[in-house]
Amino acid sequence: PWFEDRRHATVAQIKEQLAYREQNAKEHENFTISRKIGDEEYFMYIEEVSGVPTRFFVTRLSDYKAENPDIISFKDVISCVTDIQVRDEEIKQKNAEGQMVSCNPRRYKHHHDFYIKMEIRNNPYFDDIKFRINGSCITLETVGDIGGGFGGAALAGLFQGVGLSTTGVQTHSYRNSSENRRYEECRMICERIEQAVEDGKR
């Protein structure tokens, strides 16, 4: 599934890819799922031997054998990082003249998407993978600025999203417990994936 250069492949390369897919499907028959990490979008299935992570695959489908996702050895993971992509949006309101103006104090929405990015070696078809953790965008709202700046308000929203203190800062996030909870859950999922990779690389 991570192989994306089929259009430019030769007949021989396509045959090699099909043989690779067939061998991967056979490996699934011998893959023992020890645990699963994920909640909304993609799930990481991990095989362990004596409590040590050895292999994994990533899929969003419950019928994963039909998809035949690539089985990857943890020893072949060069790096694993969490990538939180944020899109900031100022919330505005209409004034008496019907113009859209900033609120006082200013209000913002911060849209978050969590991704895991891995560098992979010893695979002829891909050298990196990236998959999304949250199923839909996580939106946190903040009001007020830190030091009078937009970026400061966004930063405070992020801090509060993960439960960090913003004491003394003139900002707070609105009480959207479900979105704050989703943010924290996705952050913890990413931490567990990173830890599994570290444990498997040892």
Give residue ranges: language-model regions:
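Intrinsic structural disorder
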Residues: 1-2, 77
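Anionic N-terminal interaction surfaces
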Residues: 2-67
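Generic detection of short hydrophobic beta-strand segments and adjacent strand-loop junctions
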Residues: 31, 35-37, 72, 129-131
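A structural detector for beta-sheet-dominated domains
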Residues: 34, 47, 59, 75, ...
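Short small/polar-residue motifs
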Residues: 39-43, 76-78, 102
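Short connector loops at helix/strand junctions that flank enzyme active sites
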Residues: 53, 72, 111-113
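Short coil-to-beta-strand transition motifs
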Residues: 66-79
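Acidic, Ser/Thr- and proline-rich intrinsically disordered linker/docking segments
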Residues: 80-202
